[in-house]
């Protein structure tokens, strides 16, 4: 297969679709953040998938940004960098949850409990130092990145505009999470997951359209112009 910008954009669209569906779907099967669950197979599978979601999401938003880099301007760049940093944070956090927490749960359950408290929204007690600021940092870049990138998409008029609005609104809605239990608040991810998948589909469709032979151009192997 020949590697072209069109093919890469299409692949980024598929990556974003997959990442969005994973982000939303994981919320329904995520085990409760308790030490007893950390060594189970369900915990491992969910966090392997979350690492994959982070990698695919990073590839997806990169393709989205490059598709509309001129139209989104500085606002789009800011949103892309913030969301990219969010996905990198997700990858790092999920790696810890998948590969570091299970041994800790057996050998040092009190430390595993403290780490789960950070990721689960429990109040920090200072025992883990700077690590306790991860949840606040992740919230900030998620909120600001989703808002700015979503608005930039809407203004650019290149990809699905209402998907951009859904991304912005879903990201901003996380400000209400302190009002709900963590098990309920995690479903605030659904609008963002849908928006990312929607934008990925929009990117994929637009890539297929622009990648098609233009009207009246010669198609390789046919020897003459073919009207589209």
List the predicted regions and their residue ranges.
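Hydrophobic, aromatic-enriched alpha-helical segments typical of multi-pass transmembrane helices
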Residues: 1-228
């Amino acid at each position: 297969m020949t590697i072209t910008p069109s093919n890469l954009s299409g692949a980024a669209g598929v990556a974003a679709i997959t990442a969005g569906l994973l982000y939303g779907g994981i919320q329904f099967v995520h085990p409760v953040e308790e030490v007893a669950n950390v060594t189970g197979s369900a915990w491992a599978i969910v966090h392997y998938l979350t690492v994959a979601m982070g990698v695919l999401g990073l590839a997806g938003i990169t393709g989205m940004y490059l598709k509309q880099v001129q139209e989104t301007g500085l606002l789009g760049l800011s949103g892309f960098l913030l969301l990219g940093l969010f996905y990198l944070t997700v990858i790092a956090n999920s790696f810890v949850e998948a590969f570091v927490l299970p041994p800790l749960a057996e050998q040092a359950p009190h430390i595993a409990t403290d780490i789960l408290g950070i990721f689960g929204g429990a109040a920090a007690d200072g025992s883990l130092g700077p690590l306790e600021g991860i949840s606040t940092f992740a919230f900030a870049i998620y909120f600001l990145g989703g808002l700015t990138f979503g608005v930039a998409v809407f203004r650019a008029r290149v990809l699905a505009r209402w998907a951009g609005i859904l991304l912005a609104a879903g990201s901003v809605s996380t400000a209400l999470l302190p009002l709900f239990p963590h098990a309920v608040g995690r479903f605030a991810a659904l609008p963002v997951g849908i928006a990312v998948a929607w934008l990925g589909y929009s990117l994929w469709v637009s890539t297929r359209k622009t990648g098609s032979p233009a009207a009246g151009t010669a198609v390789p192997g046919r020897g003459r112009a073919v009207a589209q």
